């Protein structure tokens, strides 16, 4: 069983923003896996299904970014899932736009959603897929809550597809394989 959480902020006003790239990847995964992420559970929009004999739970926390840990904590405790089977997908301002990075574990890198998750799970020992949103030209809040420029959309759309493929590869072939295939 895998719990896969894409981080973002709920509400129409945040759709398409840099901070919501995790939600975009969950939507892409749902499409690829034939799932609907519409049920409200664990303070999240949830989709449940199966892939290659594994139960898959897709989460889009509805707690707002800085409290993402509440949703993930509830799901992890409900399913009694080992942390190596929890995959978190989120934006990273320190990665170039459109780049993805997969890691087995690590710090929050200053990302408040990840701070919340690490604090509530009491561990940094879970896989994550980071999607580069580029360095801010202006202040950080305006950057992460801003929408992608028209010139950036093709690159970010490709990154979302690549990140979804990377998550599928983690499930099928393990994180080491996915890291060597997708970390460029």
From Swiss-Prot:
Statement: the UniProt record of this protein carries the keyword Transcription: no
Pfam families xrefs: Pept_tRNA_hydro
Residues the record marks as active site: 19 (proton acceptor)
GO BP term, example: rescue of stalled ribosome
Main location as per UniProt: cytoplasm
PROSITE patterns according to UniProt: PEPT_TRNA_HYDROL_1 (PS01195)
Key word tRNA-binding present: yes
Annotated GO CC locations: cytoplasm
Top-rank taxon: Bacteria
Cell location: Cytoplasm
Alphabetized InterPro entries for the sequence: Pept_tRNA_hydro (IPR001328), Pept_tRNA_hydro_CS (IPR018171), Pept_tRNA_hydro_sf (IPR036416)
Residues noted as binding tRNA in the record, renumbered to the chain: 14, 64, 66, 112
UniProt-listed Enzyme Commission number(s): 3.1.1.29
Subunit structure, as described in the record: Monomer.
Function text: Hydrolyzes ribosome-free peptidyl-tRNAs (with 1 or more amino acids incorporated), which drop off the ribosome during protein synthesis, or as a result of ribosome stalling.
HAMAP family documented for this protein: Pept_tRNA_hydro_bact
Protein known as: Peptidyl-tRNA hydrolase
Gene of this entry: pth
